[in-house]
Amino acid sequence: FCKVHICERWEEGRPLLRRELNDADVAVVGSYFSDGVAAANEVLDSAALVKAFYDIDTPITIAKLQAGDEEYLRRDQVPQFDLYLSFTGGPMLREIENSFGARRVVALYCSFDPHRYRISEMDSKYVCDLSYMGTYAPDRQAKLEALLLRAAQGVPDKTFIVAGPQYPSEVSWPKNVKYIIHLEPKFHPAFYCSSRFTLNLTRKHMVKVGYSPSVRLFEAAGCGAAIISDGWAGLESFFHPNDEILLDESTAEVVRYLYEVSPEEAAGIGKRAQQRVLAEHSADKRAAQFEELIGAKSLARQYA
């Protein structure tokens, strides 16, 4: 349904981009692209009917612009886009409008593929009481140690699994914690479906601004996982606490969930979370939102 062109150098990509822009109805530039400033100029100078910037790193982008860092987007380019789409919602949207002069700022959150992330058969390799999937991140590690590793040390009768690369060799894994350095995406559904609960931890800059759900959060919910998550502003607009997701702020709280929430209750939480993301956060839902935002029906009428 699409063409993908991969260019090693911007000099190779520029002529191709210009050709594609000649008859483009909509042109979108993504964030954290090393030649983003040059690409944005090409888009803004084009005849595309709708010119948009899609920021999947909104807190980082805004922090950079505030510091005068224009690595992939210039401050003066922001007001020139017809539409500024953001992975982050909430108050930050108004800040982009008020401080940077964006014409129209709208949250277009991440999404998940329900054909890949769905309820799967359990796999004995991943059966445990609490799982966590995530690449090592220094600003998340303290939470992982408090909410999983310390919990594991205190409940030797429970089992835990951590999956993700780049964890330092000095990390001390308790005996009842299994560490998997890499898990292929095709095994993700079985991973989520084989643990009683799965833990969601959020990067510090995303917690600070709030309204920044991760792809992993939606993918886990798509698999019907009972999610235990750290809290952040806006989380309740994606999942109802204690009904579709459980919130934790301490080791003791995690341990309490492990002992007091029955398998049936956990399954119910996971099922309701799955229903929520299927209704609101699947890839097709997000595509429909995008089409509505760019006025796809109006564009189509011009060619009728």
Give the location of each predicted region.
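Proline-centered loop/turn at the N-terminus of a beta-strand
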Residues: 49-50, 83, 104, 159, ...
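Conserved catalytic-core segment of nucleotide-activated headgroup transferases in glycan assembly
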Residues: 113-197, 207
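Structured loop/turn residues at beta-strand edges in well-structured enzyme cores
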Residues: 22, 46, 79, 100-103, ...
